[in-house]
């Protein structure tokens, strides 16, 4: 008999099976499945949204970007993007990150980088006003070739602060125009309708005070921390990164040039090689000197720009603090009106108590008079009751006595200062 062959040996398997690697599935077309069958589908929560991009020249464009693209483009964590979602209500905040500034003030929510501003494509009037005003300012500076001391990110941040402060101040002025007439009317006419109106206005005042106080605290927090202000200077960090990259590139080119001049075996040793090596050393020394000089200039410019940012924040801090002072004055006026109303209500209550006291004294005197007259209404056998004129004298004397008694009560109350003199 011939040699039996193992039907399960690798040599007897078909070519298309033996050529596949173990552990990799095979499809019916002879191709391996290298990915998830639904790799083309987007992950949940990665839907695209409309964003408005404004560059340094004032040109705006609408972009369709998803959350992951924004995070990668601006180097932001996902929690910072939640501040930009108009569906959620978050307190006002200004966050400085490595490559961007996340701003959420009032209804203006945007991402500011060293080159562009990205904001939600909302139809809110504040966002539309911010977009048009920023584009107009940037385009005017670009057309007139005006060089401003403030970098791009500070210009965008300044406009956000300006519009937010104007919006808050307008809300405060509107509330003042509505509150003062109502309080004056309430001081003269205390009614349930006026009290309910003042209660609603006081709720609006409390909400607006919290919003203004949050903006004021956020600006003050930035002013108190120099590191946060330095972190917000994106243009300087970008220039330093580019300078550092160019220095590394020069160093690498110098090292390659030096190694090619020294290690070359095909060319004979000549003064040219030594010259190239000396040139590489000189180039590296020059680049190190230039790098140290640039770092010194960058550090000094950071200090100057921190001062610029601090002055910018301080200016708007004064504006917000003035708005907060208006709200405090308005709250004090409401408290004074409430105190006046309580005084008036207390006065009315005292008058009611005085009237009740007089009525009680009159009731006591009338009860005495009624008790005396009731005696003559009894069926008693006495000579006094037989004389008709006696009853008239008794009534007269009792009435005069009750009058003197009531007058004595009034004098006693005045003596004890229960009644005003």
Curated annotation (Swiss-Prot):
MF terms (GO), sorted A to Z: magnesium ion transmembrane transporter activity
Transmembrane feature ranges: 357-377, 393-413
Cytoplasm in keyword set: no
Gene Ontology cellular component annotations, sorted alphabetically: membrane
Membrane association type: Multi-pass membrane protein
InterPro entries xrefs: MRS2-like (IPR039204)
Functional note: Magnesium transporter that may mediate the influx of magnesium.
Organism: Arabidopsis thaliana (Mouse-ear cress)
Chain span(s) of sequence motif Required for magnesium transport activity: 377-379
Keywords: Ion transport, Magnesium, Membrane, Transmembrane, Transmembrane helix, Transport
Protein name (record): Magnesium transporter MRS2-5
Summary of the tissues where the protein is detected: Expressed in the whole plant.
